[in-house]
């Protein structure tokens, strides 16, 4: 009854009994009165179904006989045929027709009068019905329209309809198939009786071509899905369209699928030279050159003559596999078939030969192509330059560049970028910088790789000003150097004292909107803390958190280490608390930094207490943390406690390393307990831990201090037998020992040996030698060494002068030192005396 509310003229003449007498078809047509009516009265469909299936009502309701329904269909058929056969669309007639039409009725009737349809009028009808009335045509109806448009040579219109259909931009009557792509192909195939073979081929051509060209990202896969559907229904696309499909697959690097599709194509059409060439290209690019050569032979056996492109494809494939002899055979075969090699042929050969480092053959081909009237173009020269760069022949690449310029060819951005890559690989920072400047001045596009390579090279050569200038050029072009390069640059700037530049660069990146990663920020924090610029480091830490950037454990460890280095333990422990609050668990390195900081402040008890607290909080001490505790105790002259930590370490099965042993050995040597030190050295050897240079330094120095110099000399020789070369500290310890014993001849021997081994004396070496000669009464040699020391830029300290004067005092007083002294000695004595009394 709700229908009567929408049709007052009908309702005035009809009663409910009339409404009940409507057939299902009448109700369906009535429901098409308007789109609004259809939506509001969805419930009628259900009630109508129930109404007409009720056994009681089936006996009461009047049903029209078949002749009435046939008459109604004939009338609708005539109206549709009349509207769609006109030269232009009658809007009013169309509107009236749509109100009484269902999609299924149109789908059933449309093929019957297709021969009378004007394709343009039908297109307008479809547009009006779908766009203005949301009329849902079936897929078959759309495909029939596409076929009619193609039959009328209205290819563009047919293409637009198909694209809108694929994109889902038109309402479509739902079909049973889940995959709409297959459904469209299936609908086209179902119209085989409606069109001749040519139109069916055009339809399949259009579908494949639209998928491949309109949907570039995954269109070839869509086309590949529908291709078997069409092929199995006998709707084979043309050879041209098949080639479009195969080419699309090659461009998508789907070489195997291309070869499989080629096999399907061969079942429906006889491949021509283009199809064969595309398949050969797929085999070559897929690394199946042998299959490509076989297909080439099969092509010739089939009577299909290869063209220049076919030969070039095979030659390129053979070249990529290093089979250049066969490639040259195919080149000769080209000539035998009456085809001259082209510029592309020669370019392929030159590029492949240079990459294979067959430079002589490459030059031979280059000369041949010039003789044949194919002067190399920019692409050929660029390939040559690139190949030489890859082969490590930078000089040859530069020669080719010069030859290119002499032939009147201009360098391209590709040429510049390739040469820059070559200069960077060879570490030629000046040339790389010059070329990059030249590129920028010309206005060429510089790729990110060139910028990055040059900036990295400049940083390694400490040319930071140039590096920063190029970073500025990158930022002007909204190019980010990347986290790795930025980290390297900031680390380099900080390492060489350019902290203000590093700070400026860091802020510049943030203000430009680029994301600065945690590793880069950590590099800046490390540089500032290492330089003692804690205020700047604290400011950066606040900026990081204020901008919502991330701080990790490394960030906090860096700040804690910086605070401990400047003896700001309160701030260090404050960062520890903040670190924990942010959910970052301190690691052993964190604890070790703080323990070391406490020891450096002579807070030994606090360090031991903190160690115990850390263990209670879950710290599992490792060799590094034990090393810090042992070193701290030993430096605080609490060697016994250091030994206790060593014993605890062994009981916990934490294996000590050379550094741990060295801490204890050095402490025992300083306190004169050589037996304990030597015992530890034997323990090291027993455990397979080799003593290092520092181990022998402590032992030799310890022996020399207590005048056991000959034993120290034996350790010195033992060290050499272990493969360790003595350094200035070992020589100095022995010289000091012999000097105190007055054995200056042995001192001189050691000094000569130092010179022969290119080991240069340091301040301590000179001091102990001066003291030895002064005590021995050799004032002249002591003065000479003092002057030599100054000449080498080593500044004497108070200990040096003390040793110098002490020798004179031992010989009879300072006044005696002046007797018989020349001007140089006199000045040295006066200066030494002044230093002592200051």
Swiss-Prot record:
Gene3D superfamilies in alphabetical order: Tetratricopeptide repeat domain
SS bond list: none
PPR repeats: 238-268, 272-306, 307-341, 342-376, 377-411, 412-446, 447-481, 482-516, 517-551, 552-586, 587-621, 622-656, 657-691, 692-726, 727-761, 762-796
InterPro entries: Pentatricopeptide_rpt, TPR-like_helical_dom_sf
Subcellular location: Plastid, Chloroplast
Cross-referenced PANTHER family: PENTACOTRIPEPTIDE-REPEAT REGION OF PRORP DOMAIN-CONTAINING PROTEIN (PTHR47938:SF7), RESPIRATORY COMPLEX I CHAPERONE (CIA84), PUTATIVE (AFU_ORTHOLOGUE AFUA_2G06020)-RELATED (PTHR47938)
Family under the similarity heading: Belongs to the PPR family. P subfamily.
Name of this chain's protein: Pentatricopeptide repeat-containing protein At4g19440, chloroplastic
Organism: Arabidopsis thaliana (Mouse-ear cress)
